[in-house]
Amino acid sequence: MPLIFKIGYNVIPLQDVILPTPSSKVLKYLIQSGKLIPSLKDLITSRDKYKPIFISHLGFNQRRIFQTNGNLKTITKGSRLSSIIAFSTQANVLSEVADEGIFETVYGKFHIMIESIEIVEVEKLKEEVEKHMNDNIRVRFVSPTLLSSKVLLPPSLSERYKKIHAGYSTLPSVGLIVAYAYNVYCNLIGKKEVEVRAFKFGILSNALSRIIGYDLHPVTVAIGEDSKGNLRKARGVMGWIEFDIPDERLKRRALNYLLTSSYLGIGRSRGIGFGEIRLEFRKIEEKEG
């Protein structure tokens, strides 16, 4: 079974800077230019939509920085920002991980320091699953999350509606969330041709789950620029949804996949910071349901 590496960084601008859109481009630029963990460059440039890498938006005061209204975000010199890179690779990346350094980028000059390193054996996530079999699952969307409901189309219909742009769900179902997590997990372990299984798993999870509560809201966010320099925008979801899956086998699988996505994210554009999630758990009360 593969390993997941999660590295937390402190990112301090050494001058006033205007952050790029999205702000994750600062660390992405350093990787692509070979200045930070160069072994990840091929993973970043891969066209695989479920590739095992997540680069968060920069954070300030425990909130992710992303652009919603077209206004650029200016950060003052000396501000302490945070970021996370999570990934899985066969390369010997630990030899490339430096504790700190000062880096020139096209966005300004930054002092970058490692705050934390976590290495997770995917197989051992099953131990964490068992701890939460009697809990409700709360999925919190830390950054705007882009989930296409077309993931729940039967595979026999996927090609027919391939060119229909329905946007992203701003009220995602349990099945949609866990189907995306399943796809991330399968890509991580090298399991191929999973479209039928993902569809069945999503439909079953919708049918056999119960929603305990939610606080979800849509957000329109800039995801980058087109070839003419115009902002590209998408409408995603933030907030949280809490649910339980009474069927033990199904819940065990859902927890396993969601725990993986708590490192690698879910949905579209995870490689530039969208779809960051955090799992929270609450004991099931007898009166629920």
Swiss-Prot record:
Primary enzyme class: hydrolase
- Membrane-spanning residues where? none
Assigned keywords, A-Z? Antiviral defense, Endonuclease, Hydrolase, Magnesium, Nuclease, RNA-binding
Which cofactor(s) are needed, names only? Mg(2+)
In Gene Ontology terms, what is a biological process of this protein? defense response to virus
InterPro entries cross-referenced by the UniProt entry = Cas6_N_arch, CRISPR-assoc_Cas6_C, CRISPR-assoc_prot_Cas6
Entry's Gene Ontology molecular function annotations: endonuclease activity; RNA binding
EC numbers for this chain: 3.1.-.-
Partners and quaternary state? Possibly part of the aCascade ribonucleoprotein complex.
In UniProt terms, what function does this protein have?
A: CRISPR (clustered regularly interspaced short palindromic repeat) is an adaptive immune system that provides protection against mobile genetic elements (viruses, transposable elements and conjugative plasmids). CRISPR clusters contain sequences complementary to antecedent mobile elements and target invading nucleic acids. CRISPR clusters are transcribed and processed into CRISPR RNA (crRNA). Functions as a ssRNA-specific endoribonuclease, generating an 8 base-long tag known as the 5' handle.
The family this protein is said to belong to: Belongs to the CRISPR-associated endoribonuclease Cas6 family.
From the Swiss-Prot or TrEMBL record, give the protein name: CRISPR-associated endoribonuclease Cas6 2
What is the species of this protein? Saccharolobus solfataricus (strain ATCC 35092 / DSM 1617 / JCM 11322 / P2) (Sulfolobus solfataricus)
